[in-house]
């Protein structure tokens, strides 16, 4: 069947080089942000049925609040959000926060307490909905609008709660001994550390305070010494047997040991093992099989063991020896003397089981629970005398109180996994068994069993996304509020109050505001282009509150870890101090409910790879063998090779194919979005790939976006998910299109309550956060049928729904007169003339008229002492016209400020009396264009305070806005009418009427002609016999009226908002914002780059005729230095050049075939050529089935150059590139003969020429160049400020002074240190001298010297300057320096 190109030929078709089929759908790229915040707010969930997560959990954890006496209680019932006051665009324009009011329903219960029995009965219940401040909402693109600017909350990586075992790598002690430690980290609450010291005693620390023996902690948990030993050691019973002792034979404790003396069977008396023989597992097994039960031992064998129980005389209660005491001759004598013939002994052999806990117990000074509790109390609260109650309460609150200690579900799950427990994840506090299990495992580690944890493993680090960060912040706010509520409940007459009176929501609202405004993780969105937006939202930062700091973070934390595979990109991270601390999520990764990053894998069942996709976190993945995505498969999904490269437990290895459990989904699941946009990434060195992915984020949107010839197939995904290109919300037919909006009549999803019309407003020349230009252009035409998700309009840096960050430029790699030395870039003038790399930047200027002490400032056109020429661009209100061309120093908004009265001379008074006052008491404070900025005014916004009269300009802007809203309403109304009346006439047709408008005959059969005789508004008067149809007519009428009134209401609300005054900062009467569009052509000093980290600065722009040219006379656009490739090892750019050259060659052929088709009407050669280019493969089939119109459209798209996609790690190889070159009729060396543009002579050797996708980066020379004459000075030091933003000067710094000193240039030096810097009096004198035409001046004392003197005085040194003039005689007496 002939296929048509998707809905309007406005979708780029690419030849696809990938060989690995895409099995899993790539998740939405900003899912991380949206899902997390939705889970926090749960707006969609019904009020009563919300699960205990997010905001619900916060309220549940703080409420109910009981007053101190227990006489009343405030309970939480539910919460809901009201619709936000302003929509996203209004908030952007008015500098507001996009937020919805949060209403919480609270229930106040008052109790009657019986004074005798203390029994409570409910006296009164009151319920009320209370306003709890505004909660910021997330926009559809995953951002927040705070005070009118878009911000992003970056996700934070932090150490997961749970238990971690580690050692100090032998650094703590000089012997290099490994000291093991365990740390229990809760989500909130006290940290518990358990650690060994160099003497192998086990200590515990709480919150990194002073250490106490771990046995004290165990005693505080209610254990005694014997119980502690019983928990950690096994017991053996030594029985008296004649002269010696019988000891049980336990082969498991003897493995690998040596028999020091001969071993004798206690039952038979025979020697079973000779002295000095090694006890191998085989030998021990033979002895067990022979039936050896017990060995004979002498007294010597008992010495050095420890008692497992107290040795007590039960009749008198006398304790001879305590559990844990060492057995030596003396103790043995005591035991035998008192007639004990059985001795319980601890199973400590110092080889497999160490005596650490026993040694700790004997070193511990605390004897019982009370001592231990007191000791812990003294550590936690030094200086306070402990009592049993206070000590017990404090100890319980540390780890066992859910209010203060929360492991979180994650912590509990991690703890269960590490310690082999199975506790419900609702148990969020520690238990005695948990602490025991931690100590046991730590001791086992010291005994050499088990492994320590790898803290950088992604199984031990988790992500806190927006929702969770917000939840923690809101909890803090509510806890602050809780204290105030409790106090108020106690102090107020509780019977008469409502919940509203108890609550002051300020702390909660302030916590939210503080988080969005000043948290380290709430960042100003990087909005240079769509890619930088998406990357910013997918960023993971290890910094921030509760995270690492740059200075403390070592090498290991920053390094790439095997578990990053498929979860965090190994390439994209900043260069500089943050390297490795700020990462990017990989393309297919997602964050699970516990906050761990998961990556998708295909299941392998019975040796065959299925399309069943499974998401696993790093912990879960460790046990599987995972094959690479590029492993070769047979048609049935089995592996071709006997041995397959795979990953297992962090190692890469070759393993037999039968052992495989999983397989990667796609080769690009390893890298981030930005890295996946680099073609031939696999041929680039990692350092350059890092620069390439970072520099794509800095590419400025150009005037004309152009998609790359050589892409990777990721481009449409980024354009769609970033929200730069507009996608259709639902299917429909395009009804109207102009530059500012698209109106679509919906054909699907037509619910009763929903409007049947979608209006898409396009952003025109809006300013982004980085001053780049956001502009959207429609792609559809009237009558187009669109489906859901189709691209309707291109945005900044998008071209037919593909991301387009730069332009395809014809590049030659060759030196050119030294102009491409050190990575400089040589450009052709054509690039400037054709606006290839021209971008538009929008600057915003705002001016406020305040109410000052001396009177209000005024925005006006009559400014004192300003010529009419300077006011030519201002309207009668004193505000610049839209479309005016402005340059540095031009007035944008005229403003005058009243100035203080100065005393007048009698003459002035006379003149004032004669000519009237006014002119002199104001000064000009107009807003002017800053130096170095030229541009065109594109937008002006005027904001007035409530009750301040609006000027002409404000009224005009308001009228325009209302007209726009009215047009939207009318269009929607027209489409509604057309739909409804169309359906109405269909229903009436063929029916017999029983009533109708005036003058209508009953019983007539209705037809189009009959009905059309009457005006539309009267059609509702027809009634028909068929009752079913009649009821449908009535339902339609109701639906129509409801839609109409809803439309009108929406319009009225918006108009009311427009006409209402604006919220203003205190003291501001009026505010004007002026937006200036600046057109920046490329010029020497601008920074450019390719996608492979090949960056450089434009050194010169050469006339076209001087540039090297090809045999057909085409001049190259860019000349790059060939020496930039070998040492940098980014060979991807060369492959891109060749492939781009082939694409352009094919494009030329297609262009010629289009001309041929126009001449002879035969489309077959064109179809064949396009078929040859596309080749075979899954993505190619649809192109082969295109109808003629679609083939022509595609050819038109491809005539400048064929679009191809070469996915990362699965792209075109050298053979493919050669095939493409041959297909295009070019040499497969990819080189061409070039001629020198200036002499016309041929260059000696062939030159590599081709197309590279070049980007212009947001480092423009216009933003950096800066000059200053007189400007602002620092108040204290009186030296000029620094930097362009402050209009500062160049610093003649310390090293420059040394240079002058070295040259002995005394006068220049004096000048630099005084009159040209901070000698205030000297500066004025120089100025006066220059004005007089005199060139003598005197240097005084620099201000910085005075500052130094003041600082010395502040340190208590009396420094005085003697101001004496020397006369001739004294001067001659001074010692001569030359002597």
Curated annotation (Swiss-Prot):
GO MF, one term, reads: ribonucleoside binding
Chain coiled-coil ranges? none
Q: Which GO terms describe its cellular component?
A: DNA-directed RNA polymerase complex
A single Pfam family, by name? Answer: RNA_pol_Rpb2_1
* Entry keyword set: DNA-directed RNA polymerase, Nucleotidyltransferase, Transcription, Transferase
Answer whether the UniProt record assigns the keyword Nucleotidyltransferase to this protein.
yes
Name the Enzyme Commission number(s) assigned to this protein: 2.7.7.6
Gene3D superfamilies, sorted:
2.40.50.100, 2.40.50.150, 3.90.1100.10, DNA-directed RNA polymerase, beta subunit, external 1 domain, DNA-directed RNA polymerase, subunit 2, domain 6, RNA polymerase alpha subunit dimerisation domain, RNA polymerase Rpb2, domain 2
Subunit note: The RNAP catalytic core consists of 2 alpha, 1 beta, 1 beta' and 1 omega subunit. When a sigma factor is associated with the core the holoenzyme is formed, which can initiate transcription.
Question: In which family does this protein belong, per the annotation?
Answer: Belongs to the RNA polymerase beta chain family.
Query: NCBIfam families, from UniProt?
Result: PRK00405.1, rpoB
What this chain does, per the record? DNA-dependent RNA polymerase catalyzes the transcription of DNA into RNA using the four ribonucleoside triphosphates as substrates.
The molecule here is called DNA-directed RNA polymerase subunit beta
């Amino acid at each position: 069947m002939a296929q048509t190109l998707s809905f309007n030929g406005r979708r780029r078709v690419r030849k696809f080089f990938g060989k690995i089929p895409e099995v899993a759908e790539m998740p939405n790229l900003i899912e991380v942000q949206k899902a997390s915040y939705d889970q926090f707010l749960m707006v969609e969930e019904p009020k009563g049925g919300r699960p205990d997560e997010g905001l619900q959990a916060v309220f549940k954890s703080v409420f109910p609040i009981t007053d101190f006496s227990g006489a009343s209680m405030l309970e939480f019932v539910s919460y809901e959000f009201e619709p936000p006051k302003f929509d996203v665009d209004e908030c952007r324009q008015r500098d507001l926060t996009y937020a919805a009011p949060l209403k919480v329903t609270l229930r106040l219960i008052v109790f009657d307490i019986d004074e005798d029995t203390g029994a409570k009965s409910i006296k009164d219940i009151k319920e009320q909905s209370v306003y709890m401040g505004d909660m910021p909402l997330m926009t559809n693109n995953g951002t927040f609008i705070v005070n009118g600017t878009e911000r992003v909350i970056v996700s934070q990586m932090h150490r997961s709660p749970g238990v971690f075992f580690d050692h100090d790598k032998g650094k703590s002690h000089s012997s290099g001994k490994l000291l093991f430690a365990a740390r229990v980290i809760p989500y909130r609450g006290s940290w518990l550390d358990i650690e060994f010291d160099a003497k192998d005693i086990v200590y515990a620390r709480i919150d990194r305070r002073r250490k106490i023996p771990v046995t004290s902690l165990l005693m505080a948990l209610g254990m005694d010494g014997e119980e502690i030993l019983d928990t950690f050691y096994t017991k053996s019973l030594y029985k008296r047997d004649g002269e010696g002792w019988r000891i049980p034979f336990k082969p498991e404790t003897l493995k690998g040991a040596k028999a020091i003396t001969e071993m004798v069977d206690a039952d038979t008396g025979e020697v079973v093992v000779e002295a000095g023989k090694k006890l191998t597992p085989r030998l021990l097994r033979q002895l067990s099989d022979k039936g050896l039960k017990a060995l004979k031992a002498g007294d010597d064998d008992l010495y050095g063991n420890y008692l497992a129980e107290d040795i007590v005389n039960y009749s008198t209660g006398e304790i001879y020896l305590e559990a844990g005491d060492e057995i030596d001759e003396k103790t043995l004598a005591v035991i035998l003397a008192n007639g004990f013939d059985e001795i319980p002994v601890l199973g400590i052999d110092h080889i497999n089981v160490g005596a650490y806990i026993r040694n700790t117990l004997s070193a511990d000074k605390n004897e019982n629970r009370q001592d231990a509790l007191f000791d812990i109390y003294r550590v936690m609260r030094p200086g306070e005398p402990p009592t049993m109650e206070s000590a017990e309460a404090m100890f319980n609150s540390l780890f066992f109180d859910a209010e203060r200690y929360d492991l979180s579900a994650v912590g509990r799950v991690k703890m269960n996994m590490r310690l082999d427990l199975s506790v419900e994840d609702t148990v969020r506090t520690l238990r005695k068994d948990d602490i025991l299990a931690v100590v046991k495992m730590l001791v086992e580690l010291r005994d050499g069993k088990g492994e320590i944890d790898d803290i950088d493993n992604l199984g031990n680090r988790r992500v806190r996304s927006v929702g969770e960060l917000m939840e923690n912040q809101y909890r803090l706010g509510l806890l602050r509020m809780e204290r105030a509520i409790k106090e108020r409940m106690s102090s107020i007459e509780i019977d008469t109050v409502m919940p509203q009176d108890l609550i002051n929501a300020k702390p909660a609202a302030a916590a939210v505001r503080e988080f969005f405004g000043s948290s380290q993780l709430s960042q100003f969105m990087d909005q240079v282009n769509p890619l930088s937006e998406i990357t910013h939202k997918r960023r993971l930062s290890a910094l921030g509150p509760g995270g690492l700091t740059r200075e403390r973070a070592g090498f290991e934390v920053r390094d790439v870890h095997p578990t990053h595979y498929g979860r965090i990109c190994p390439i994209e991270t900043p260069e500089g101090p943050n390297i490795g601390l700020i990462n990017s999520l990989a393309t297919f990764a997602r964050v699970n409910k516990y906050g761990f990053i998961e990556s998708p894998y295909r299941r392998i069942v019975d040796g065959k790879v299925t399309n069943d996709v499974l998401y696993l976190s790093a912990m879960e993945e460790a046990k599987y063998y995972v094959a690479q995505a590029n492993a070769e498969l047979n048609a049935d999904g089995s592996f071709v090779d006997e041995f397959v490269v795979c990953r297992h437990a962090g190692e890469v290895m070759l393993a037999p194919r039968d052992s495989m459990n999983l397989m990667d989904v796609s080769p690009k699941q390893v890298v981030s979005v930005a890295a996946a946009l680099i073609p031939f990434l696999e041929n680039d060195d990692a350092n350059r790939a890092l620069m390439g992915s970072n520099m794509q984020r800095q590419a400025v949107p150009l005037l004309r976006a152009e998609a790359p010839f050589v892409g990777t197939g990721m481009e449409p995904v980024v354009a769609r998910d970033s929200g730069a290109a507009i996608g259709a919300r639902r299917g429909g037919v395009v009804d109207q299109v102009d530059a500012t909006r698209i109106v679509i009549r919906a054909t699907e999803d037509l619910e009763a309550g929903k409007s049947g019309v979608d209006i898409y407003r396009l952003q025109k020349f809006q300013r982004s956060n980085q001053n780049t230009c956001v502009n959207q252009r429609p792609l559809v035409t009237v009558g187009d049928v669109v489906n859901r998700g189709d691209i309707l309009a291109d945005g900044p840096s998008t071209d037919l729904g593909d991301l387009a960050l730069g332009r395809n430029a014809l590049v030659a790699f060759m030196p050119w007169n030294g102009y491409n030395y050190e990575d400089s870039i040589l450009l052709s003038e054509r690039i400037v003339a054709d606006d290839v790399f021209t971008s538009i930047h929008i600057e915003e200027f705002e001016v406020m008229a305040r109410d000052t002490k001396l009177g209000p400032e005024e925005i006006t056109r009559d400014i004192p002492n300003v010529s009419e020429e300077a006011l030519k661009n201002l309207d009668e209100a004193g505000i610049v016209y839209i479309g005016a061309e402005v340059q540095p120093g031009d007035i944008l908004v005229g403003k005058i400020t009243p100035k203080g009265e100065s005393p007048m001379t009698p003459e002035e008074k006379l003149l004032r009396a004669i000519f009237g006052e006014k002119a002199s008491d104001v000064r000009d404070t107009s807003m002017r264009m800053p130096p170095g900025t030229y541009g065109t005014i594109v937008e002006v916004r005027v904001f007035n305070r409530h009750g301040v009269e609006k000027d002409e300009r404000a009224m005009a802007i308001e009228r325009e806005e209302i007209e726009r809203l009215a047009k939207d309403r009318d269009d929607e109304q027209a489409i509604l009418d057309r739909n409804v009346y169309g359906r109405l006439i269909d229903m009436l047709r063929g029916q017999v009427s029983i009533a109708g408008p005036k003058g209508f005959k009953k019983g007539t059969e209705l037809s189009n002609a009959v009905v059309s005789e009457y005006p539309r508004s009267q059609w509702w008067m027809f009634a028909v016999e068929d009752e079913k149809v009649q009821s449908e007519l009535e339902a339609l009428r109701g639906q129509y009226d409801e839609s109409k009134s809803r439309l009108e209401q929406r319009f009225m609300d918006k108009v009311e908002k427009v006409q209402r005054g604006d919220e203003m900062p205190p003291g501001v009467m009026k505010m004007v914002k002026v937006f200036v569009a600046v057109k920046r052509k490329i010029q020497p000093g601008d920074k450019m780059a390719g996608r492979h980290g090949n960056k450089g600065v434009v050194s010169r722009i050469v006339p076209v005729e001087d540039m090297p040219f090809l045999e057909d006379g085409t001049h190259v656009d860019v000349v790059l230095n060939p020496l930039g490739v070998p040492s940098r090892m980014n060979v991807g750019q060369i492959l891109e050049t060749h492939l781009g050259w082939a694409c352009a060659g094919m494009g030329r052929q297609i262009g010629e075939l289009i001309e041929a088709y126009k001449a002879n009407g035969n489309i077959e050669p064109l179809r064949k050529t396009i078929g040859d280019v596309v080749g075979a493969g899954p993505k190619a089939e649809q192109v082969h089935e295109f109808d003629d119109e679609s083939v022509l459209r595609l050819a038109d798209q491809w005539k400048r150059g064929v679009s191809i996609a070469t996915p990362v790690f699965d792209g075109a190889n050298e053979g493919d590139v050669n095939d493409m070159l041959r297909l295009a009729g070019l040499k497969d060396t990819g080189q061409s003969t070039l001629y020198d543009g200036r002499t016309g002579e041929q260059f000696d050797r062939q030159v590599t020429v081709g197309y590279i996708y070049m980007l212009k980066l947001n480092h423009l020379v216009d933003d950096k160049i800066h000059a200053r004459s007189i400007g602002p000075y620092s108040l204290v030091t009186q030296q000029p400020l620094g930097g362009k933003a402050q209009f500062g000067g160049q610093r003649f710094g310390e090293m420059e002074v040394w240079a002058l000193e070295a040259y002995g240039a005394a006068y220049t030096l004096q000048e630099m240190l005084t009159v040209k810097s901070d000698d205030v009096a000297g500066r004025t004198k120089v100025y006066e001298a220059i004005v007089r035409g005199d060139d003598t001046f005197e240097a005084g004392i620099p201000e910085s010297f005075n500052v130094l003197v003041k600082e010395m005085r502040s340190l208590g040194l009396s420094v005085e300057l003697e101001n004496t003039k020397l006369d001739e005689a004294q001067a001659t007496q001074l010692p001569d320096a030359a002597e």
